[in-house]
């Protein structure tokens, strides 16, 4: 088993600290907002600030350290309001400056590529577009309840009240609390100097730890299972106490999933009908070596369709080693008997997400990529989803994590993701009153007219983009080749082999 060292020596860093480099257009930056924004609370010209979650590197050199401040402004914010003027809400950001820890400012030109785990979509020019209010269960039921408000008002009011309780209208406004994560892309190259400062003090694992890891990985299954079917790959391994791990993930904004119960089923239904998030949504049970996971962590914003998630299993005969399978849900897919989440093909992106989030908290003491190649890892499991991976495992050693770094004013674990009851009730009444022949005709004509001016939406960036990964930790150049691990014989369109 080969080990790919993930560390920078101080001498190597200092040797290029005075060299200028060009960060090419197309480079992605992952930014965590410290300013709450929204279509109804933000205005053109409002200032916005955030922090880089992952350090930005190019050709093996750190150019923008982790936790650098990013400044921008609201270029435009269009509220949905009563829906008389606009089909959907929208907001457009313009980030223009990065400030390093030493005070140096770097001008940048960017566009928003994706809002992490959000129901909102992004147009090709970077405008964030909100949901359409009629695309909901409440709107469908309004076709029945709305006429009753006019034909038999007392009965219609009763039916409307019941409908508002069982299928409230979603809030079409955009709201991103502090802690929302944006994936930005440079639209023009940036010249800057490589940084001699590490975002964290990354160390190498000791030979004893590497030997322990090698023995554990060789004796463990490389893929979790759901019943008799292969599922998520083991791509991370943690060394540290249970308490340190819980503190680190809490500081990083990851929360534990709830167990399945009647109450969790109600909350899931509530989130689906309102098109809101459910941060602690239950997850399917997966086993590794015949054992169910000890922890299930996840991170999402305002939708149940998308989330980052990580299952953890305690290593055999030990209390300080944890095997993990990290993946990202990007939507729903339906089967004959049920529906489930569809995962992003590139699981290395999610491995990088987990490590970078923990590194941001300052609780990461050491990390190393362990190269793993095994015939059974590449076997065809007769599934329908494809996986892109270099097959490496990120081995992370945590410190005690008594004082994690937390962005001031940002509560990642409990950010607001649901409208108030008043907002929801008003939205239901508004939609019902609008379901009549006159307004439906007007709304249809308006929708057809405005669609001529709306820009097309981006494809899901989780598949066709390259968010910050772990190149900042690697002694190898960026752009390391990945293997195409297939779940069936034919690769999907656009997949890289």
Where is each model-derived feature located?
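Bacterial N-terminal signal peptides
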Residues: 5-17
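Contiguous beta-sheet cores, especially beta-hairpins with glycine/small-residue-rich turns
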Residues: 21-198, 267
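Second-shell loop/turn segments in exported
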Residues: 60, 172, 230-238, 337-344
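Compositionally biased P/S/T/G-rich terminal and signal peptide-adjacent segments
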Residues: 199-227
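Terminal, regulation- and interaction-focused segments at domain boundaries
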Residues: 218-248
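Non-catalytic interaction/regulatory modules that flank or connect domains
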Residues: 231, 243-268
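A cross-kingdom signal targeting lumenal/periplasmic-facing segments of multi-pass membrane
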Residues: 262-453, 462
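Long, low-complexity, intrinsically disordered segments
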Residues: 470-497
